[in-house]
């Protein structure tokens, strides 16, 4: 099997499974739908691992070829092709590996769904195909199609329960916010096509960069901007939407309206990292603009800290993990801004495993609670759900950066990258990610203690009903006990827990201090020496652990855990008093900094008001009443006046004829004698 065939199989097998489950779901049934999609993703996962191993042992070389030319227009060729290198191979394993776990988990989670079971499996396999096409693309046009495809499938999955108004509102919100980002992304691609040699293939664009290094573009009369900087910022606007960076982050928490498995696959491990992957892939361009890198770093720092604050007050178990995702995406963006692209991609990988684990463990707890998602109704689930308890503990320990867990190596590396960066804004970024360590540890273990320790709070509640999942699910009754989830749910948790512990230790040497990303990621060491300083300071996993003992990071994390234990185990009455004491801050957090209100009342209503104005003035007054109906009224008015000449008397008509003859004679003589 040649390389082209291998990569086509990896990309297309999930698509085939999606089409079979979607088009023939009623004929093959529920078992047939999940079997064919799981087999398809499993084939892709195994072959992706084979490809990655080939790069690790040195038997596989970088692949960059076109499959076919899709469109030729005006001397421009738009092709479909594959670029497979170490970064692509790593992402292929992450996407297909997490997707396989989610497919298996979904069998148990969606077991009670009466309708839409086959449709759901079709969607998640279609998403896997779309994400693979995005990361394997070798040109901007294919990247954009993959970019839009994952957005479309995300829209379909967030609104999976389309009879629920909150779900349809959430998927529309996600769709519109991402269109804002995609508009900037498309403008950036347009600049690449117009000024970077007339090609959209990555290798051609990178080769042309020296020709536009000092080029400027006039956005406003008399104001010259660096072409590279403008292009970088516009491309990053797309990343802000897709990777949920402030202020385009508002769609992600609401995306929790979709079933839990897609939260793990799309909104934690894969789609939301697409923007980060794109920036890393474009490192040769971004390295030419320190201004763009500073902007990226500051936006990432704002997202990391201020989204973490919002996670502190959430009571929905899934929304805690959602805001955790936002904060961690901010961490990765800080690394990109510090030119530590390899560190960002390292955290993309480790985060994919432990965050997917946290989402799926949250879903398991929801199953045990009969689909009640409110943590205030839980407590002491450790007694009833030991596997879920242990795996969520592992996920949270990795999230907060506990030494020897995967998240420790990547997260601490990001903090060190911000520390060593010399770009404007790096001081604020370092403070933000450092403060976020405490915040992350606090909200992660607040969730953990509320769910798995303390009193069994559902026993003191009136009989309640929750619409947290499906259409007809109820929470636990007073005398009911939670139950551990079936093996089809807990097995993916166990399998994800393993890389959440060990993958960081295994991968840190080659990915950060070795040649794993050689010739894939470009860093201008003279202008942005961060990663090179880190290579001199640290020499692997054990060096990072040793350093942590002398760093404030570890002690901030411990302080966060102890604070959560004190407030939610020892003194559970205290959080309500603190919230009342700091009521203005609590209200600010509760209203998510009023950004939703701003977007709805200013932009959404403003757009509707502007549209109403143009409709009333332009469409109704000018076009309808003026041009269309107005012309008819004018003809009618003229006809009414002409009609008065129709008297019915012969002498009137004779006089008109004489008058006409005189006019004609006058015109004739005027022409002859003038």
From Swiss-Prot:
Keywords: Cell membrane, Membrane, NAD, Quinone, Translocase, Transmembrane, Transmembrane helix, Ubiquinone. Gene3D superfamilies: 1.20.5.2700. One of its GO terms (biological process) is electron transport coupled proton transport. It is an enzyme of class 7 (translocase). It is a multi-pass membrane protein. Its EC number is 7.1.1.-. It catalyses: a quinone + NADH + 5 H(+)(in) = a quinol + NAD(+) + 4 H(+)(out). One of its GO terms (cellular component) is plasma membrane. InterPro entries: NADHpl_OxRdtase_5_subgr, ND/Mrp_TM, NU5C-like, Proton_antipo_N. Disulfide bonds: none annotated. One of its GO terms (molecular function) is quinone binding. Pfam families: Proton_antipo_M, Proton_antipo_N. It is found in: Cell membrane. It comes from the Bacteria. The chain crosses the membrane at residues 4-24, 36-56, 67-87, 90-110, 115-135, 140-160, 180-200, 219-239, 259-279, 293-313, 348-368, 385-405, 425-445, 488-508, 549-569, 653-673. Belongs to the complex I subunit 5 family. NDH-1 shuttles electrons from NADH, via FMN and iron-sulfur (Fe-S) centers, to quinones in the respiratory chain. The immediate electron acceptor for the enzyme in this species is believed to be ubiquinone. Couples the redox reaction to proton translocation (for every two electrons transferred, four hydrogen ions are translocated across the cytoplasmic membrane), and thus conserves the redox energy in a proton gradient. This is NADH-quinone oxidoreductase subunit L. The gene is nuoL.
């Amino acid at each position: 099997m040649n390389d082209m065939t291998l990569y086509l199989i990896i990309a297309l097998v999930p698509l085939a499974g999606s089409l079979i489950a979607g088009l023939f779901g009623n004929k093959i049934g529920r078992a047939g739908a999940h079997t064919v999609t799981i087999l398809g993703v499993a084939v892709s996962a195994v072959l992706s691992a084979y490809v990655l191993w080939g790069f690790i042992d040195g038997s596989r070389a970088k692949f960059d070829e076109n499959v076919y030319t899709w469109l030729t227009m005006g001397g421009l060729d738009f092709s479909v092709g594959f670029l497979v290198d170490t970064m692509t191979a790593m992402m292929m394993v992450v996407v297909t590996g997490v997707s396989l776990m989610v497919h298996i988990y979904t069998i148990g989670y969606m077991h009670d769904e009466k309708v839409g079971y086959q449709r759901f499996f079709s969607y998640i396999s279609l998403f896997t195909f779309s994400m693979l096409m995005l990361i394997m693309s070798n040109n901007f046009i294919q990247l954009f199609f993959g970019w839009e495809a994952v957005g479309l499938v995300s829209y379909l999955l967030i609104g999976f329960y389309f009879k629920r108004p909150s779900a349809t509102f959430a998927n529309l919100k996600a769709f519109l916010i991402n269109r804002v980002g995609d508009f900037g992304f498309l403008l950036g691609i347009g600049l690449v096509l117009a000024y970077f040699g007339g090609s959209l293939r990555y290798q051609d664009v990178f080769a042309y960069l020296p020709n536009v290094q000092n080029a400027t573009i006039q956005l406003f009369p008399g104001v010259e901007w660096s072409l590279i900087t403008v292009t970088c910022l516009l491309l990053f606007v797309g990343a802000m939407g897709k990777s949920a960076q402030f202020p385009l982050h508002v769609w992600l928490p609401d995306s929790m309206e979709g079933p839990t498995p897609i939260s793990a696959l799309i909104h934690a491990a894969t789609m939301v990292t697409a923007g980060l992957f794109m920036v890393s892939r474009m490192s040769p361009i971004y390295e030419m603009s320190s201004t763009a890198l500073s902007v990226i770093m500051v936006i990432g720092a704002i997202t990391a800290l201020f989204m973490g604050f919002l996670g502190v007050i959430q009571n929905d178990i899934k929304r805690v993990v959602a805001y955790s995702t936002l904060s961690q995406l901010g961490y990765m963006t800080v690394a990109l801004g510090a030119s530590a692209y390899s560190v960002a991609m390292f955290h993309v990988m480790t985060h994919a495993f432990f965050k997917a684990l946290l989402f799926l463990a949250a879903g398991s707890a929801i199953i045990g609670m009969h689909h009640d998602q409110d943590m205030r109704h839980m407590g002491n689930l450790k007694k009833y759900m030991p596997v879920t308890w242990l795996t969520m503990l592992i996920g949270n320990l990795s999230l907060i950066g506990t030494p020897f867990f995967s998240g420790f190596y990547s997260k601490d590396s990001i903090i060190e990258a911000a520390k060593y960066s010399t770009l404007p804004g790096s001081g604020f970024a370092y403070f933000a990610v450092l403060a976020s360590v405490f915040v992350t540890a606090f909200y992660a273990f607040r969730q953990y203690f509320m769910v798995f320790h303390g009193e069994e709070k559902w026993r003191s509640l009136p009989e309640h009903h929750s619409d947290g999942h499906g259409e007809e699910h109820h929470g636990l009754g007073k005398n009911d006990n939670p139950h551990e989830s079936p093996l089809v749910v807990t097995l993916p948790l166990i399998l994800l827990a393993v890389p959440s512990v060990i993958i960081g230790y295994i991968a840190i040497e080659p990915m950060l201090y070795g040649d794993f990303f050689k010739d894939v990621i470009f860093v201008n060491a003279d202008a942005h020496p961060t990663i090179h300083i880190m290579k001199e300071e640290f020499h692997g996993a054990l060096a990072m652990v040793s350093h942590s003992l002398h760093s404030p990071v570890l002690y901030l994390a411990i302080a966060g855990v102890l604070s959560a234990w004190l407030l939610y185990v020892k003194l559970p009455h205290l959080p309500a008093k603190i919230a009342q004491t700091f009521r203005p801050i609590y209200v600010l957090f509760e209203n998510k900094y009023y950004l939703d209100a701003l977007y709805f009342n200013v932009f959404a209503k403003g757009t509707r008001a502007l549209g109403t104005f143009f409709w009333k003035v332009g469409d109704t007054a000018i076009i309808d009443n003026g041009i269309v109906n107005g012309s008819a009224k004018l003809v009618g008015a003229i006809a009414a006046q002409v009609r008065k000449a129709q008297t019915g008397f012969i002498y009137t008509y004779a006089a008109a004829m004489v008058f006409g003859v005189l006019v004609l004679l006058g015109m004739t003589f005027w022409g002859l004698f003038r």
